[in-house]
Amino acid sequence: MARGLNRVFLIGALATRPDMRYTPAGLAILDLTLAGQDLLLSDNGGEPEVSWYHRVRLLGRQAEMWGDLLDQGQLVFVEGRLEYRQWEREGEKRSELQIRADFLDPLDDRGKKRAEDSRGQPRLRAALNQVFLMGNLTRDPELRYTPQGTAVARLGLAVNERRQGAEERTHFVEVQAWRDLAEWAAELRKGDGLFVIGRLVNDSWTSSSGERRFQTRVEALRLERPTRGPAQACPGRRNRSREVQTGGVDIDEGLEDFPPEEDLPF
């Protein structure tokens, strides 16, 4: 089994004023919405800007410390991890991939450029949106092609994490790869170890029941296959890493909303 690695690094502007609340047990929860624009290199040499909004959660003493000090528009650096949560609501299982902050620090905004969305909320241009994961595939990759012939692969990654004084937890992350990277990933199999470098994106859609649904996933920019573990027993498959310039998707539309508070596991 691949050694678990689960790190998230974000630099963005606070799209709104952070929201502070407490659990019945008295635990402080600070929810922040960071907004930014990633500058990507496309296949044709262009540099499109792709907008993102990520919800970050800070707990405990740090939440109380920063709750009254942060305000809309401030630039913030976040180091944290992805945390998978599952709960049941009205007999239906729900899940969420959350960004849990371990460290937060405001940044000097001199020389930084901002943009505004249609609601006047700030986004940081040339922001930072990076994820590093290592885990094992939970299923064989699913490869398909768009009507334009572009390859896209979906992968499920299980990341094991053991923190000091706590039991081991497994976080389940959906990963998407495009073009040559997708075709390379399609040769992997369930159980293979995989190291992923990518960026966080959000999907939203309407279910068959008319309910709005959301999913946070990782768009892979680089994949590496460790030589140890289950993957080592497959000498006929390519033992190479692959990287791409950009996933080529625009997530600027449809991300104005986030799951309502009653859908969150707190």
From Swiss-Prot:
One of its GO terms (cellular component) is nucleoid. Residues 5-108, 128-227 form the SSB domain. The keyword Hydrolase does not apply. InterPro entries: NA-bd_OB-fold, Primosome_PriB/ssb, ssDNA-bd. GO terms for biological process: DNA recombination; DNA repair; DNA replication. Residues 226-266 are annotated as: Disordered. A motif (Important for interaction with partner proteins) lies at residues 261-266. Pfam families: SSB. GO terms for molecular function: single-stranded DNA binding. Residues 250-266 have a biased composition (Acidic residues). Keywords: DNA damage, DNA recombination, DNA repair, DNA replication, DNA-binding, Repeat. HAMAP family: SSB. Plays an important role in DNA replication, recombination and repair. Binds to ssDNA and to an array of partner proteins to recruit them to their sites of action during DNA metabolism. NCBIfam families: ssb. This is Single-stranded DNA-binding protein. It comes from Thermus thermophilus. The gene is ssb.
